[in-house]
């Protein structure tokens, strides 16, 4: 189980990313269409003034049940070992376990 503080930090990052999403996209479009280098630097400075945690690359997917940050399956939003346990317990419809 992940620490509660780490999970709350991820939620805070998600909120910041949603809040600044349009601002970041519009400034990136302005950078690509700016004719001179000095204008690009001004727009880039505006982009840099936004919080670091508003960048989408700072987000990290976590397991829905345990909060584990690694080995997550996007379709189920679960980590690998929790997914395996749920499949073996027949809690996920449509998922089949492999047997050799």
Curated annotation (Swiss-Prot):
Its main location: plastid. GO terms for cellular component: chloroplast; small ribosomal subunit. Binds 16S rRNA, required for the assembly of 30S particles. InterPro entries: Ribosomal_uS14 (IPR001209), Ribosomal_uS14_bac/plastid (IPR023036), Ribosomal_uS14_CS (IPR018271). One of its GO terms (molecular function) is rRNA binding. This is Small ribosomal subunit protein uS14c. It comes from Oenothera argillicola (Appalachian evening primrose). One of its GO terms (biological process) is translation. SUPFAM superfamilies: Glucocorticoid receptor-like (DNA-binding domain). Belongs to the universal ribosomal protein uS14 family. Part of the 30S ribosomal subunit. It is found in: Plastid, Chloroplast.
């Amino acid at each position: 189980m992940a620490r509660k503080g780490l999970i709350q930090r991820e939620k805070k990052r998600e909120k910041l990313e949603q809040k600044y999403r349009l601002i970041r996209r519009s400034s990136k479009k302005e950078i690509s269409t700016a004719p001179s280098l000095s204008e690009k630097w001004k727009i880039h400075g505006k982009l840099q003034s936004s919080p670091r945690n508003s960048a989408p690359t700072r987000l990290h997917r976590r397991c829905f049940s345990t909060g584990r940050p690694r080995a997550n399956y996007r379709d189920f939003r679960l980590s690998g070992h929790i997914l395996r346990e749920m499949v073996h317990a027949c809690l996920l419809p449509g998922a089949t376990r492999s047997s050799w």
